[in-house]
């Protein structure tokens, strides 16, 4: 009797783990496998990141901790490799659309998760360089999944945000 009660009470908790989180039918595990299948990166069995939703203000405060809050901060998410955590804005940001918003941000941040654990952070010349593959794989995911093409990245924006300032730079949280 006690065993049955425990199973009934604990079974729903099994589906709270990020690997089982519903991202339009995709699991974190299947998304990481897709990244590996479509890139030069390898997954080494590292624990999957914790995934949380935050207000856009919280996201921006984390990325820019010493800056004054400002309304034009439009960061949709970030991967914190020190805490193995992905935060995604809980509302659609200005330059994205609603169609599969959370899923699209998640695939981008999972690219950074895989990059970090595959050693790409050490190989990259600068942090912005890490965004090249993240944006490219994000756009490929959008195409393959039939997501609204308005969700794709503006090519000029990608060029601008992936340029290294001086070829060097600290590798911190990526977004």
PLM regions: where:
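Active-site recognition of the HExxH zinc-binding catalytic motif
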Residues: 104-117
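Soluble non-cytosolic domains of exported or imported proteins
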Residues: 22-26, 96-105, 124-132
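Bacterial N-terminal signal peptides
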Residues: 5-14
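Substrate-binding clefts and substrate-entry loops adjacent to catalytic sites
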Residues: 89-96, 114-125
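A metal-dependent hydrolase signature that marks the N-terminal structural subdomain at the beginning
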Residues: 15-72
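Active-site scaffold of zinc-dependent metalloenzymes
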Residues: 65-99
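Post-HExxH zinc-binding segment in Zn-dependent metallohydrolases
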Residues: 125-159
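Short, low-complexity, Pro/Ser/Thr/Gly-rich segments in the mature regions of secreted, periplasmic
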Residues: 157-175
């Amino acid at each position: 009797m006690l065993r049955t009660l425990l199973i009934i009470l604990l079974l729903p908790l099994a589906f709270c783990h990020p690997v089982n989180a519903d991202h339009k039918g995709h699991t974190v595990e299947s998304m990481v496998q897709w990244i590996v299948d479509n890139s030069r990166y390898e997954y080494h069995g590292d624990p999957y990141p914790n995934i949380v939703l935050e207000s856009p203000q919280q996201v921006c405060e984390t990325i820019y901790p010493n800056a004054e809050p400002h309304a034009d901060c439009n960061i949709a998410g970030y991967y914190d490799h020190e805490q193995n955590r992905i935060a995604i804005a809980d509302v659609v940001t200005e330059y994205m659309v609603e169609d599969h918003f959370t899923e699209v941000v998640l695939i981008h941040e999972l690219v950074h998760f895989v990059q970090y654990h595959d050693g790409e952070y050490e190989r990259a010349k600068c942090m912005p360089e890490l965004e090249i593959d993240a944006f490219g794989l994000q756009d490929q995911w959008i195409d393959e999944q039939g997501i609204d093409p308005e969700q794709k990245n503006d090519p000029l924006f990608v060029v601008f945000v992936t340029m290294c300032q001086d070829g060097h730079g600290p590798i911190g949280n990526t977004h």
